[in-house]
């Protein structure tokens, strides 16, 4: 059996870059750094199912960070308390204090500036009746701007993420649960908010319709090409339209796996996004009254069609640091984007072909001011090999990718980066590359490929 995870919304400010560690078996260590005003740095040591340790870090280290050790596997974090506040010369709020609580009744030191244990700012608590925290997400730049957590809940037939409802705090709680997929959405609005949401789900070949809020005369309809199309993300806004009404959802924007978008409502108020990278939306929950007051979602795995030709994954090469990613398996690669930083490759993104569709992969790493360069494959061209180099650089514990060069059945790309460090090559004779995987943080630490045999028709 798999597990269901509850993803709590971020607390803190809107500055910095968004990051998401996803989930692991447990947390082994937490390191926290601070200056006179705020939490400037956070680092996590996670343990995977196979026992391998994965490290992630965010922010900047101005002083030697303090360490909090969890006695894994007999002890785990069950709660995080903290505060956030706007400090001098910073436009948005940042995290100003953190305390971690464990299943053994222990507390970490109070991290962050404080006067005799007294902190300032808006306080927050992440806790779910003793449930185990198995991952973190947040925002960070020069400091830690915001923080959120993942709790592990019940066992399910497949991995499932429940993203907390965001929006207003009033109204009746509703929860559709999770399904195989979504076929149709029907949405109505008045002059200031989303008043009605109707969802047609499918489970085990049978349709089920759930509706919430107050239905008007002519709701708008958004039909998905189920099962080949699914919702990747929902971008929403919420605010209190007037003194007589609850805070409610004011707009909804749906993005699908086919690249289609559909917008409803009025783009006013505070924004939030419901998304779990590499997963698809399979259910909604939230709060309702005369309108949709709050909205959350369930995300499940994207079904992977069994390829007619068996694929083979070649292990990633480089350093063991950052968030693990895997774009999956496709028919081929159509476009490659590579961004470089001062010391190596900081960013990669791939566009794949699947049947007649072009499927953009996720961003991996972080773009710098230098932007990204493109290598576009032509019709009848396929990727056969990658050559590259990886090396250790100052300030980073694990090696990073410093150069990449791509070879097709027709030509070679220019080298992206400098040929220094250890050289590597990925590919096999008689095969083509149909997917990528690896690890990345603000840089690309490692890269691997998925290959299939070249057919006689290619």
Swiss-Prot record:
One of its GO terms (molecular function) is carbohydrate binding. The keyword Repeat applies. Disruption phenotype: Larger PYK10 complexes. InterPro entries: Jacalin-like_lectin_dom, Jacalin-like_lectin_dom_plant, Jacalin-like_lectin_dom_sf. It holds the Pfam family Jacalin. CDD domains: Jacalin. Residues 5-153, 160-301, 311-453 form the Jacalin-type lectin domain. Keywords: Lectin, Repeat. Belongs to the jacalin lectin family. Component of the PYK10 complex, at least composed of PYK10/BGLU23, BGLU21, BGLU22, JAL22, JAL23, PBP1/JAL30, PBP2/JAL31, JAL32, JAL33, JAL34, JAL35, GLL22 and GLL23. Inhibitor-type lectin that may regulate the correct polymerization and activation of BGLU23/PYK10 upon tissue damage. This is Jacalin-related lectin 22. The gene is JAL22.
């Amino acid at each position: 059996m798999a597990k269901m995870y509850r993803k709590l919304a971020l607390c803190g400010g809107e500055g910095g870059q968004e990051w998401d560690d996803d989930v692991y078996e447990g947390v082994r260590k937490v390191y926290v750094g601070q200056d006179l005003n705020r939490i400037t740095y956070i680092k996590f040591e996670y343990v995977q199912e196979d026992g391998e340790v994965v490290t992630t870090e965010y922010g900047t280290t101005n002083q030697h960070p303090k360490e909090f050790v969890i006695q894994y596997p007999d002890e785990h974090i069950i709660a995080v308390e903290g505060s956030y506040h706007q400090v001098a010369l910073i436009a948005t709020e940042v995290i100003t204090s953190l305390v971690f609580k464990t299943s053994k009744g222990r507390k970490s030191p109070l991290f962050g500036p404080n006067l005799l244990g007294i902190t300032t700012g808006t306080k927050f608590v992440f806790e779910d009746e003793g449930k185990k925290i198995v991952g973190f997400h947040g925002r960070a730049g020069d400091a830690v701007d915001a923080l959120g957590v993942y709790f592990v809940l019940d066992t399910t037939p497949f991995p499932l993420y429940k993203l907390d409802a965001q929006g207003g705090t009033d109204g009746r709680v509703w929860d559709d649960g999770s399904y195989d997929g979504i076929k149709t959405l029907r949405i109505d609005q008045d002059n200031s908010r989303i008043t009605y949401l109707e969802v047609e789900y499918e489970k085990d070949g049978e349709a089920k319709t759930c509706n919430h809020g107050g239905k008007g005369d002519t709701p708008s309809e958004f039909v998905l090409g189920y099962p080949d199309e699914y919702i990747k993300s929902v971008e929403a806004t919420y605010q209190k339209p007037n003194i007589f009404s609850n805070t409610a959802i004011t707009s909804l924007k749906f993005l699908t796996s086919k690249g289609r978008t559909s917008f409803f409502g009025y783009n006013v108020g505070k924004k939030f996004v419901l998304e779990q990278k590499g997963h698809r939306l399979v259910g909604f929950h939230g709060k309702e009254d005369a309108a949709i007051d709050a909205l959350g979602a369930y995300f499940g795995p994207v079904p992977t069609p069994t390829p007619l030709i068996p694929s083979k994954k070649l292990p990633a090469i480089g350093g063991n640091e950052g968030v693990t990613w895997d774009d999956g398996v496709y028919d081929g690669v159509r476009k490659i984007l590579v961004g470089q930083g001062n010391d190596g490759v900081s960013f990669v993104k791939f566009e794949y072909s699947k049947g007649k569709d072009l499927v953009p992969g996720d961003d991996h790493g972080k773009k710098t001011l230098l932007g990204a360069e493109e290598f576009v494959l032509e019709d009848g061209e396929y990727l056969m090999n990658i050559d590259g180099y990886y090396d250790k650089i100052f300030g980073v514990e694990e090696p990073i990718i410093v150069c990449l060069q791509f070879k097709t059945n027709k030509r070679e790309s220019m080298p992206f980066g400098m040929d220094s460090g250890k050289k590597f090559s990925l590919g096999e004779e008689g095969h083509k590359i149909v997917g990528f995987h690896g690890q990345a943080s603000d840089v690309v630490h490692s890269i691997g490929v998925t290959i299939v045999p070249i057919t006689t028709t290619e």
